[in-house]
């Protein structure tokens, strides 16, 4: 949107620059209130991990614990959006998953038990992208993915062939998109997630 850029981070922070990044203003932050009489809000203090602006006014931010926020005024205000299916089970729930967490020792070699997630009721949403057709895709941990064909008004859970975390997604022309994540896994779709094809990266490193 011209010289306007956005960035997201910890404590639900959203920053905006109107001059190409020379100066920034805080549009939103949601720092965890640790005072003794504070009401518990599980969304407080949760980091945001990606942001997608569709134009100068409309956009979405995604983050940990299935956070999905929407703005219609250039980021002046943000509201929570429910995918309604974020906690739904999927075939990936029956697989041993792979997460970013490491054990308490100094070893970087993890067993499948080490990589298994105990609670995936609110999986992290790691990235969001728009395809050339205008559809939106969200990817997250443990193979979680969602798509929207109506500009984010409604969301549909879709299946990825890999049950580990996906860290990014890129939208191309039409319904073409590429998702990438743990252990060098990259998958490509030409039909907005109806089917996926693996792309050999030649690496087991996370992407």
Positions of PLM-derived features:
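Residue-level hotspots at or immediately adjacent to binding/recognition sites across diverse folds
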Residues: 1-207
